[in-house]
């Protein structure tokens, strides 16, 4: 570059508003690059630096700095969750709306952190992690929670570091990464602000101490891993590769069943020994179960189809008996086909499928469930788990149970009903508990499952996740979903195995190590031998105390700052802006102090 060009760039950067925008959108870019698909994970310790530079600025440049920050967040989230547009044209609306909502956390983080730094004089290495954790905790809770693309998730490969998730959760790991980044920022500033160099170096040292202490804790937790006891659970995870679309295809059910059956038989033939459990992903058995409430009276034509004509002299009691037999026959009809497959596999089988419960208590007469059904080697059903946490707008529309017309505005024909309780089934002397789809993305859902079953004396030895990620065409959604499961395994100290259509099927131990992983958008069968963990964890006992603690501290400090009288205040608030040309809003105080 010529001297004139360098001078031109220098002149451009001297404009405070342009520099501010560069930092805002530069941070959006770096925070995107540390997540899949780029996945430059080690840069996670540097990625927040542009936003931290904004936090440290005495004033924000430009007339609408908060709008600029929101726009930067909007650009970031549009790129980070671009895969949300893939399932159906209508989901592009959800992609934009969700990105617009998530974008608000960028200005919120900077506003909170600036209030702590400039309003209370807190060091950046304390203010930034607390503000970040508060925002991520709120993001994991508001509207049911959205936890993908968390800062802590970038570090899933650093097994020693993420052991602390069993105490502070994934949100806390993000706070630790932010503390490390803030320490680097303080160290960099110490070379510029020579008068405060000692203080800033002390802050950097404190941040390094936090990271070192986290690694020390992680090393200790890894040293406490239980020795293998008894035989591992031998699981065959079947991963087909069928891209999922919202369209009616009368041949799809048979094609999907044949696809998965062929893969299963091929997987079984690869070994002389049978696995303890075969697992198919979510909804890969397309002929759903049917249950009929005894309070529901079947049409007589349906009863005749199932049982034949009634006797001419049948009385009311016999009519009720025929109703009960017909209900049982309808339910058994769907189970009989499943039993054929289970007997051929000759072992336990966990299969994802839908279920309809016909009942007068439902507003439309039918409740729909997303289920995981256990069958034994003889084809007998052992237990059925109904998904407890349906995805908002993906599997149900809020208030549509009262206003059914809302479904006509979406590609969904109907909404799912939430299941009522978790299930654990004993297989080969191990207790196995299923989850479905994004339940592994919800920290409190998995914690609740383990705590509920533990209270009943049935703490799971293994959690199985059934998921159909074929909606997302092999995109970075697969990586984000798998990463969430890794953190859940550490938090509850329970191995997780995943059967995923199009990937990633996986086996994860109780320390978050990825033992097996299937390919992206391709078929595979994984033979995972899973050892229970069973360690207790602070997360199981206390939950998101670190995340909510950060929310409480930051909220209290922010409210206190807002209520604190400021007589004689002569400068704009810490989060305020200055005009583009940089003029002061009020005269400089005589003392020169800000």
Provide a role label for each language-model segment:
Residues 2-224, 258, 466, 473-475, ...:
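Membrane-embedded alpha-helical bundles of multi-pass enzymes
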Residues 23, 46-48, 190, 201-202, ...:
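Polytopic transmembrane helical bundles with strong interfacial aromatic enrichment
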Residues 556-581, 585-586, 593-594:
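Juxtamembrane interface at the cytosolic side of transmembrane helices
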Residues 84-91, 142-166, 340, 363-443, ...:
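Active-site catalytic loop in hydrolytic enzyme cores
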Residues 218-392, 424-429, 434, 438:
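Soluble catalytic regions of membrane-associated enzymes that act on cell-envelope
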Residues 363-386, 504-530:
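Amphipathic beta-strand/beta-sheet edge segments enriched in Tyr/Trp
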Residues 2, 354, 589-591:
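Serine residues within intrinsically disordered or low-complexity segments
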């Amino acid at each position: 570059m010529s001297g004139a060009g360098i001078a031109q760039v220098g002149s451009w950067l001297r404009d405070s508003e342009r520099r501010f925008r560069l930092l805002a959108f530069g941070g959006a870019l770096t925070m995107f690059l540390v997540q899949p698909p780029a996945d430059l994970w080690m840069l996670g310790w540097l990625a927040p630096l542009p936003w931290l530079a904004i936090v440290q600025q005495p004033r924000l440049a430009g007339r609408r700095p908060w709008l600029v920050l929101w726009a930067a967040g909007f650009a970031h989230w549009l790129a980070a969750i671009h895969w949300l547009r893939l399932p159906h044209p209508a989901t592009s609306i959800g992609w934009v709306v969700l990105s617009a909502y998530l974008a608000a956390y960028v200005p919120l983080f900077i506003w909170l952190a600036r209030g702590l730094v400039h309003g209370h004089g807190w060091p950046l290495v304390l203010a930034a992690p607390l503000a970040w954790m508060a925002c991520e905790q709120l993001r994991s809770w508001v509207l049911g929670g959205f936890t993908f693309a968390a800062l802590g998730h970038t570090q899933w490969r650093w097994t020693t570091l993420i052991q602390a998730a069993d105490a502070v959760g994934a949100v806390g790991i993000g706070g630790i990464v932010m503390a490390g980044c803030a320490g680097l920022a303080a160290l960099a500033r110490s070379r510029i602000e020579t008068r405060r160099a000692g203080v800033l170096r002390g802050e950097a040292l404190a941040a390094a101490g936090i990271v070192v202490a986290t690694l020390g804790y992680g090393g200790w937790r890894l040293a406490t891993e239980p020795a293998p006891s008894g035989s591992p659970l031998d699981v065959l995870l079947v991963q087909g590769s069928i891209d999922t679309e919202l369209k009616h295809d009368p041949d799809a059910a048979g094609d999907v069943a044949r696809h998965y059956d062929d893969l299963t038989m091929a997987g079984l033939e690869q070994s002389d020994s049978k696995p303890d459990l075969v697992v198919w992903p979510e909804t890969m058995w397309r002929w759903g179960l049917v249950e009929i409430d005894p309070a529901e009276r079947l049409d007589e034509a349906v009863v005749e189809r199932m049982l034949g004509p009634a006797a001419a002299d049948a009385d009311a009691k016999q009519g009720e008996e025929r109703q009960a037999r017909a209900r049982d026959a309808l339910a058994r009809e769907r189970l009989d086909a499943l039993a054929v497959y289970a007997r051929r596999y000759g072992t336990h089988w966990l299969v994802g499928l839908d279920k309809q419960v016909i009942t007068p208590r439902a507003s439309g007469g039918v409740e729909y469930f997303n289920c995981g059904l256990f069958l034994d080697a003889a084809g007998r059903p052992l237990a059925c788990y109904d998904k407890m946490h349906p995805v908002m707008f993906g599997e149900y529309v809020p208030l549509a149970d009262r206003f059914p017309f809302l479904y006509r505005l979406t590609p969904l024909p109907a909404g799912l009903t939430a299941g009522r309780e978790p299930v654990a089934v004993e297989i080969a002397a191990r207790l196995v508990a299923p989850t479905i789809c994004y339940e592994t993305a919800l920290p409190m859902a998995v914690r609740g499952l383990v705590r509920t079953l533990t209270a009943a004396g049935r703490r799971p030895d293994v959690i199985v996740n059934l998921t159909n990620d074929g909606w997302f065409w092999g995109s970075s959604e697969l990586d984000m979903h798998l990463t969430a499961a890794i953190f859940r395994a550490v938090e509850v100290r329970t191995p997780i195995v995943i059967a995923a259509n199009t990937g990633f099927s996986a086996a994860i131990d109780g320390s978050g190590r990825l033992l097996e992983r299937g390919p992206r958008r391709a078929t595979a069968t994984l033979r995972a031998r899973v050892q229970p963990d069973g360690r207790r964890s602070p997360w199981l006992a206390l939950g998101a105390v670190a995340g909510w603690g950060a929310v409480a501290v930051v909220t209290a400090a922010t409210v206190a700052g807002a209520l604190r009288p400021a007589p004689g205040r002569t400068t704009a608030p810490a989060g305020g802006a200055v005009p583009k040309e940089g003029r002061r809003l009020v005269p400089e105080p005589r003392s020169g102090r800000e």
